[in-house]
Amino acid sequence: MYEYTLNFERMEQAIGLFGNFDENMRIIENEYGVSVVNRGNSMKICGEPEKVSLAAKAVEGLVMLLNKGEQLNEQNVRYCISLVNEGADDRIPSLASDCICITMSGKPVKPKTLGQKKYVDTIKNNTIVFGVGPAGTGKTYLAVAMAVKAFRAKEVTRIILTRPAVEAGEKLGFLPGDLQQKVDPYLRPLYDALFDMLGADNFQKCQEKGSIEVAPLAYMRGRTLDDSFIILDEAQNTTPEQMKMFLTRLGFNSKIVVTGDITQIDLPDGKKSGLKEAVKILKDIPDIVTVRFTEKDVVRHRLVQDIIKAYEKYGEKNIKPKK
């Protein structure tokens, strides 16, 4: 049996580290099979030497985040554990990030993974950014947050959000309703992100003034967009022609963020994805950068990753070999 002791400089450290009902330390205990004891101004970790060493690294990293003003929760505790398990515990302090903006409910919007932090920093420092990766990695939400931040700081005068109105198994011409009613469901995720950060009333006022626009990609044709923060979502469903059209809308003092998941292409068979092609064609141009997310950047409920892994495992078992 091996013991590790950590002394706290302030009681607030212990309170923040352990969390409500010691939930953060329960996660550490379950992950490493150790025992964590709270002794007020100190704590002890007991167990096998190797497991205690890993748990101690995780705890020390979490204390560093607390000292930088971060609040701990299940999500960042589990992410810190994953970094420790990969031997990347020295990168934990870099998770502490400045707040991008505050939602209407008072919640700070911050990057939650190293991949997200790289994405936000890349958007800050470049004119055109491609964010490519699986669903749940915060590609669109963080891009909208950066757009709202730039708009509030008067760095741009407009926010423009767009996506192609192409989804699996549905054709707009066969859906009931007028054009606005038809395209609204496809744009709903963009509306939701803006409502979250601006509130429905403020969003509506900005939309009426023309300072915020949410529209299908086809509406971008023939325009030059100056002083704008422009986001193209679900870009894997653009054709090469649409992508070229969109990117060449860039005007002076504007920024473009393009997001998509190249594993979820809903284009008809035989159609190339404009996103896949653009990333290849533009990779050597300065001020155009691609950030790639992985499943480690998924920030949804922890069960989502378990569900994805279970389906992948099931799929591998049930793939019939070709004769």
Give the positions of each predicted feature.
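Short glycine-/aliphatic-rich beta-strand segments at the starts of folded cytosolic domains
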Residues: 1-16
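Interdomain "pre-motor" coupling segment immediately N-terminal to P-loop NTPase/helicase cores
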Residues: 37-96
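Intrinsically disordered, low-complexity mixed-charge segments
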Residues: 2, 70, 88-92, 124, ...
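Short amphipathic alpha-helix segments
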Residues: 13-30
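Conserved loop-to-helix interface motifs that mediate assembly, gating, or partner/ligand docking
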Residues: 86-107, 111-114
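A short, structured beta-strand/loop element
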Residues: 29-37
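Conserved helicase motor core of SF1/SF2 NTP-dependent helicases
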Residues: 104-116, 122-232, 236-323
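Flexible glycine-/small-residue-rich
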Residues: 8-10, 38-40, 47, 163, ...
